[in-house]
């Protein structure tokens, strides 16, 4: 045992140097103390927290920027569609037609009519025995009409008409059928069948978190055209230079001022907790009115 002790600690000396060496080792052990470990963990936690905070900020900024881009695309697409359709209001319509129906509903609503294929029309040469009877346009070319499309029949004497759905076109016989539904009345000889378009634009606020710009063509179900559009306003410029919310007659309208407001899909917590918004305004000259 003594030899083993001497091998490990060295031989004892009178001066006690061996004891001093042992004390030195005990005073400076290898590794870290508990306090040092706690400090290191604290510093690491601060660094990780700061890095995570930077990541969250950048990630949130990226999400908001993506929403802003989508918002700008939606509002531009919606405005372009309305400009294109409203500019056509009244084109090719027979006399007595109302090409614009305005509604100051806040958000506003507008309905416009125009003939989308001018020249594609045929006259009925035989009075309809029943509202469900086919339209006999003997001697007229009906090849421009397509099945499964909307058309319009107009009685110039009664100055009335309606949309109907074409189910079959007999080009050789010049007959047009509408088997899905009868008309509201029997149209006389001399009534005209034509292609006419009707577009209705309005805001659907059924889901208050996601209002949408809706478009309805003829009698089809309304469809979403642009998402997260919260406001739509129309002002009608009259021939005398005055702008009104509801025009007294479409014939005195010369221009339509459109204001469209879009917002982001979600609120921005870094923007006072509110939605980011964009508003576009366009002045459309309605060249086919008042001619």
Model-derived segments and spans:
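N-terminal leader/signal peptides at the extreme start of proteins
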Residues: 1-32
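Acidic/polar residues at beta-strand termini and the immediately following turn/coil
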Residues: 28, 153-155, 170, 204, ...
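Alpha-helix exit/C-cap motif
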Residues: 57-61, 77-99, 117, 158-167, ...
């Amino acid at each position: 045992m003594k030899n083993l002790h001497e091998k490990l600690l060295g031989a004892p000396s009178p001066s006690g140097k061996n004891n001093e060496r042992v004390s030195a080792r005990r005073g400076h052990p290898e590794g870290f103390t508990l306090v040092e470990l706690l400090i290191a963990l604290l510093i690491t936690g601060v660094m990780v927290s700061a890095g995570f905070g930077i990541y969250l900020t950048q990630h949130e900024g990226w999400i908001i920027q993506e929403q802003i881009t989508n918002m700008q695309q939606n509002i531009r697409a919606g405005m372009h569609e309305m400009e294109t359709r409203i500019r056509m209001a009244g084109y090719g319509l027979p006399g007595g037609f109302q090409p614009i129906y305005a509604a100051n509903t806040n958000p506003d609503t507008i309905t416009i009519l125009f003939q989308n294929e001018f020249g594609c029309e045929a006259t009925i040469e035989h009075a309809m025995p029943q509202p469900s009877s086919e339209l006999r346009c003997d001697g007229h070319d009906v090849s421009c009409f397509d099945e499964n499309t909307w058309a319009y029949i107009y009685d110039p004497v009664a100055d009335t008409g309606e949309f109907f759905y074409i189910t079959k076109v007999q080009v050789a016989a010049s007959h047009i059928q509408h088997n899905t539904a009868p008309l509201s009345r029997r149209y006389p000889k001399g009534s005209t069948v034509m292609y006419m378009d009707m577009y209705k634009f309005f805001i659907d606020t059924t889901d208050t978190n996601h209002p949408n710009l809706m478009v309805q063509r003829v009698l089809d179900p309304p469809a979403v055209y642009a998402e997260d559009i919260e406001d739509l306003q129309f002002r009608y410029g009259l021939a005398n230079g005055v702008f009104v919310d509801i025009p007294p007659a479409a014939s005195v309208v010369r221009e339509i001022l459109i204001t469209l407001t879009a917002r982001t899909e979600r609120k921005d917590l870094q923007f006072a907790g509110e939605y980011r918004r964009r508003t576009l305004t366009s002045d459309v000259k309605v060249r086919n009115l008042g001619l």
